[in-house]
Amino acid sequence: MSRTLPRALVPAVLATVLFACTPADAPIEAIDSVAVTFLNSGKVTPNTLPFSEAVRVGNMVYLSGQVGITPGSMTLVSGGMPAEAKQTMDNIRTSLEAHGLSLEDVVKCTVMLADMREWAAFNEIYKSYFTPPYPARSALGANGLALGARVEVECIAAARTPA
């Protein structure tokens, strides 16, 4: 038998749960104010694109998707999936380092492949950039990646030092 909460009580119950989950020593202002910084080094992609290279929110850094372009250009490296995957991961490392981070700080990656049949080939290259324990990861097939790329990877990193 399932029971439902009367509609009039829902706001009160939600407010109680949210208040109960707030740390006792955290002032409300601190919860509402998190530093947000938009980061653009120009070391991988040109600063003229309509998105940030990365965004730092508190100690979390969200990297925009990277493809296998030669740094400072909008040209994919030649050599297909293996070359693009290597350059993509090199670009991620360069972007992280430009903002005081490393691949060891990465906690999540999202991998988009133009052809899921290249998943195993990508994994071989990916594994050479990380050591266990590996970041959490999702991989999906995607049609129409930027610049006709074979692979695009976006990452989330946790900074070990405050902003």
Model regions and ranges:
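Bacterial N-terminal signal peptides that target proteins for export
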Residues: 1-10
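N-terminal presequence-like segments and the immediate start of the first folded domain
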Residues: 10-13, 17-90, 94-99, 104-107, ...
